[in-house]
Design a protein with these regions (language model features):
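Low-complexity, acidic/polar, glycine-enriched regions of mature
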Residues: 2-220
């Protein structure tokens, strides 16, 4: 009985110490899921050959697409990278005369999930107020001339987060594989630019900036 009691006490001390000095590495290594890879890594190295002229038409977001965010947390000097993801992404792009004429991307912010439900609840209710602002969007504002089927382009458009719109120029990596257009982007954002307070998770400090991440698999 004494041995069992000792084991219970040890477990309680270890878990309770997550927020204390002894806990940073335990928190990072055992209580936080390893961060997902960047969306750019999803673009296949095995690209199919395609002529830009053959990309003409309207393409729609298909299965396999996702969006979300990447932020860094700091616990007593120990860095932890957190990624949140949702598959509830919609939108389309239009290619005409070897030019990206239009693009609209919409994601359901309330559906973004990480490995921690409490973090997700804070994200929805306190940080982004998803009951008021359920969507985040990106809308292309300037046409982009396309010279390759697979390349990286700087694209200018309006991003809306938390009801706040900002004009941004973002890098988008493109590819073509299995008759699908692939688009990937990691967009640096500073929370205060969108009237969002950096999430406060008690013993964990969340940095005041992060990335919006998007991977799109588009079909005609």
């Amino acid at each position: 009985m004494k041995n069992k009691l000792l084991v219970v006490i040890i477990i309680v001390v270890v878990i309770g110490g997550i927020g204390a000095v002894i806990g940073p590495k335990i928190y990072r290594d055992y209580f936080v899921k390893k961060a997902d890879k960047s969306p750019e890594s999803k673009i296949s190295d095995n690209q199919d050959t395609v002529k830009v002229a053959d990309l003409a038409g309207e393409w729609h977001v298909g299965d396999g697409s996702y969006a979300g965010y990447r932020v860094n947390e700091v616990l007593n000097g120990t860095d932890v990278t957190v990624t949140g993801r949702t598959k509830k992404v919609s939108g389309n792009i239009v290619v005409k005369n070897k030019t990206l004429e239009s693009a609209t991307i919409n994601l359901k912010v309330a559906d973004i999930k990480t490995d921690a439900s409490k973090r997700d609840d804070y994200f929805r209710t306190k940080a982004l107020e998803t009951s008021k602002y359920p969507d985040a969007t990106f809308v292309l504002s300037q046409p982009v001339k396309l010279d390759k089927g697979a390349a990286t382009y700087n694209v200018t458009g309006t991003m809306m987060i938390h009801g706040v719109k900002k004009m941004l120029t973002i890098p988008i990596k493109t590819g073509y594989h299995n008759q699908r257009v692939q688009l990937a982007s990691s967009i640096p954002v500073t929370f205060k630019d969108f009237n969002v307070n950096a999430p406060s998770l008690g013993f964990v400090k969340v940095e005041d900036h992060g990335k919006v991440e998007i991977f799109l698999s588009l079909t005609k």
